[in-house]
C-alpha cells in the first residue's frame, strides 16, 4: 500500500515519527501541506494536524482516496486517532478494522468564481460595516429575508463549526441536508433552518460583503448559489468510533452531570 503523510509544517517531528513506523510495512511518502501538489497520489492519506489540516487535505485527495487523521490540533472533529494511538492504527490497518465515513462537499458559485467547501460558505459584513438585508431562496420555495450581519450555509460536517457557534443545530454526518443560519439577526426569533441537500440555495445581499469558504476569505460578492457537490471525501474511522461520544467529549453536549 502506498501511503502519503500530510502534516502541518510545525508538526514535522510527528510526521517523521509516523513515517518511520509506517515505512516498516508500507511504501510511504511524506510532506508538509504547503508543499503538496493539488492531488495527492496514494492509496491512503494520513493527516497529522487538526480540523483545518484535514479540510485542506480533503481538497488535495483524489475522489475515493481515504483519509485518516491524527489529532495534533485543538478539537479534531475530523481526526480519528491521537498520536499516542499509532500502534492501534497500525493494527487496524493490518486487519482492515475501519468504518468508512463519507463527507460530501458543497459547491459555491458566485461572480468571483466557483469554490468547494467541506464545512460551509459564509457571507458576512465587514466589522466596520452596517447590518445587511439578505434574501435567501431555497429552490422551489418562496424567499426568506434576514436583516443580519451575514448568513452561513453549512453541510452536516460544518454543523459543528461556525454554524454551531451562532446557534445552529448539530447534524449527524450521515444526514442529507443543508443548514442555513443567519449571523446575529435583528429579530431574536430568527433561527436556523435545515433543508434537503437536493435543493439549491441562492443568497443575495443588498451590497457586496465578504465571502468565506471554510473560514478562508476569497473576496466580496453580492450573490452566491450553494448546492451539494458531487465530490466527497472518505474518512476512515475505528470500528468502535461513536459520533455521540465525540460531541460529548469535545463539546460537552449531552454530558451527564454527576
From Swiss-Prot:
Its main location: cytoplasm. Its EC number is 2.7.1.23. Coiled coil: none annotated. NAD(+) binds at residues 51-52, 56, 119-120, 130, 149, 160-165, 184. GO terms for biological process: NAD metabolic process; NADP biosynthetic process. It is found in: Cytoplasm. The keyword ATP-binding applies. Involved in the regulation of the intracellular balance of NAD and NADP, and is a key enzyme in the biosynthesis of NADP. Catalyzes specifically the phosphorylation on 2'-hydroxyl of the adenosine moiety of NAD to yield NADP. This is NAD kinase. It comes from Thermotoga neapolitana (strain ATCC 49049 / DSM 4359 / NBRC 107923 / NS-E). The lineage of its organism: Bacteria, Thermotogati, Thermotogota, Thermotogae, Thermotogales.
